[in-house]
């Protein structure tokens, strides 16, 4: 069975099987004017497929005590099944049916569209979400990474079954990956390719992005985005678009992320919370994406201390490309990196998802092990040079009261003028 490509990840488990089917179409591929289309499609794939309407499908899955869902990420749709080994034979074909024969019933389309719009409206009340949305638009413009996978409420309102059909019809045509993790019976491996719903799957056309929507498009020259909100806190997001998963410099930036944002010993936590007490929450965000991933420092502060919080964030950002980490700090970052890897591979589902992610992005199965082996060779100077290549042109997104935003904008303008 060449499509989907089958990967097996044996894990000792009490008769549990996790399956992940990755399709290389995510929210970055939302057509212009229909942002949120792939997320809406993802929510509908588990609302009826093949011979099963939404009620029959729910009864079948829940009657087995199993879980079935589909999630839209920036780079892919990921179908997930978790069940017992005994039920795998009858439930695994559902993954193929969701891809090859989704029902997309008009009533379910209207329901899921309404639920998504309601969720987006609730998110508008969250200052963190507003700051994140502003930063995406500032950095990626109208490109594929310029919006939350859930989309834009105003554009979702126009989506119907006819708009989703072309997206659904192309799902089986690209090279997809199916990973099974847990207690995988040999007979499943031997027979899955002959199961009715997996037979005669179209040959994958490859995952070449030529002709597809760019990750960033129509990005302006502005370096600051302001989102006014009547709130008691100010959210600050400082960062820039960097590189894709598997890039030679990624490991160095991943160590910087661990140094900055992992645990109470992290630099952001120590500097902003412990030393100065200016932040409620701090984080360093650097997701593993196929395209230029955001490397973002985040903090929330009270209005009275928000300018100091911004000053501290700017100082930390500048230090990344001006002075190398100490050997002790780098060694701690290495330990955190290894710990983060281990935490991300604790369950069968996590292991299966990691396998399909690596395969879909053209990385070897032992990519993580290679990174761990390469840690010892990375020096503070190597990390400094990577920061100098990728972290020199940050953009700032703010959400807070109008008075706070004006004050912080003046502070940012002074930096730009310097």
Predicted regions and their residues:
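Short, Gly/Pro- and small/polar-rich lid/capping loops
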Residues: 1-2
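His/Glu-based metal-binding/catalytic segments typifying zinc-dependent metallopeptidases
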Residues: 7-27, 35, 177, 202-269
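Active-site-flanking structural segment that lines cofactor/substrate pockets
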Residues: 28-29, 54
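Active-site SXXK
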Residues: 37-47
